[in-house]
From Swiss-Prot:
Originating species: Mannheimia succiniciproducens (strain KCTC 0769BP / MBEL55E)
Organism domain of life: Bacteria
Function: Participates actively in the response to hyperosmotic and heat shock by preventing the aggregation of stress-denatured proteins and by disaggregating proteins, also in an autonomous, DnaK-independent fashion. Unfolded proteins bind initially to DnaJ; upon interaction with the DnaJ-bound protein, DnaK hydrolyzes its bound ATP, resulting in the formation of a stable complex. GrpE releases ADP from DnaK; ATP binding to DnaK triggers the release of the substrate protein, thus completing the reaction cycle.
UniProt gene name: dnaJ
Alphabetized UniProt keyword annotations: Chaperone, Cytoplasm, DNA replication, Metal-binding, Repeat, Stress response, Zinc, Zinc-finger
The protein's name: Chaperone protein DnaJ
Description of its domains: The J domain is necessary and sufficient to stimulate DnaK ATPase activity. Zinc center 1 plays an important role in the autonomous, DnaK-independent chaperone activity of DnaJ. Zinc center 2 is essential for interaction with DnaK and for DnaJ activity.
Chain positions of CXXCXGXG motif repeats: 146-153, 163-170, 185-192, 199-206
Database matches in SUPFAM superfamilies: Chaperone J-domain (SSF46565), DnaJ/Hsp40 cysteine-rich domain (SSF57938), HSP40/DnaJ peptide-binding domain (SSF49493)
Binding site residues for Zn(2+) 1: C146, C149, C199, C202
Binding sites annotated in the UniProt record for Zn(2+) 2: C163, C166, C185, C188
Domain J: 5-70
Amino acid sequence: MAKQDYYETLGVQKGADEKEIKRAYKRLAMKYHPDRTNGDKAAEEKFKEVNEAYEILMDKEKRAAYDQYGHAAFEQGGFGGGAGGFGGGFGGFGGFEDIFSEMFGGGASRQRVVRGEDLRYDIEITLEEAVRGTTKDIKINTLAACDHCDGSGAEKGSKVETCPTCHGHGRVRRQQGFFMTETTCPTCQGSGKKIEKPCKHCHGDGRVHKKKNLSVKIPAGVDTGNQLRLSGEGAAGENGAPAGDLYVVIHVKDHHIFERDGSNLYCEVPISFTMAALGGEIEVPTLDGRVKLKIPAETQTGKLFRMRGKGVTSTRAGYAGDLICKIIVETPVKLNEEQKELLRKFEESLEGQSKQRPKSSSFLDGVKKFFDNLGK
């Protein structure tokens, strides 16, 4: 089958300059590269054709010969072994390596720099500490720069030379036929350097496992799940790269009196049924101490009283939430006979006075209506 015209293969005019040819090649090479086409044989053949056309048209002498004689210029070894041989590798054609560097990240042009790992530390604090803020001393296990070699990985006085395999890049490229692969340098493991005598403390890594003590300032208003970021307090990076960060995750312990919902606090306040009926004044706890709360007469169980500004100061909004007290009317227990008799007389005195028992009368009315509807 006759070969397609090289200019048509790249989709350019015969008078196209090098920039147009390179731009067309880059677009087509990315489209048909085997790494992107999952083994498609047709795409692989197209990729070879695109490479062959690019090789010829980017070489001034080969392009001139092609323009004059067409494909015949390269048949039977007519032009230094013919097109498509790629005997000199990608670098020999002044453009392949640059283009593949752009397409796949350019990793061989610089030494690998790996930032240190981020670390997590979970800490428990009390509700009081969460509301007021506190400072906690913690101890973490981390990778720190080796003090013996100052993070270089080399014994003092030992030579540190550029890796002869990757020339300091940390990565190597290999050409396999039409394809180029890039891997971590097997000689230096990506460091880009060759150490004559590795540090005996860190074994050439430049980092050692170490316990580190830190003081963590926890602001007022934090809640469970909040994270504090300590920049640069994570693991040390490789080859002198920046350290990672430490994330301190807050867990607020359950409180024996209060429950928290955002900036508001909730608590249950027990009162006697006498206090509920007659009213009065009680003391309720807050995180700032006890405060007085007036209980109006005829207070029912479940009644909520809001004490403004007695909750938690929000870290975002900057204002304090409320303390919400839920009244629980307690039923007296372990009564003696005299007390029981008094209650019986009190109960008898309420007979026929439904208005004095609003919940009961409302409930009984509802029950009566329910059964009346069933009978219809």
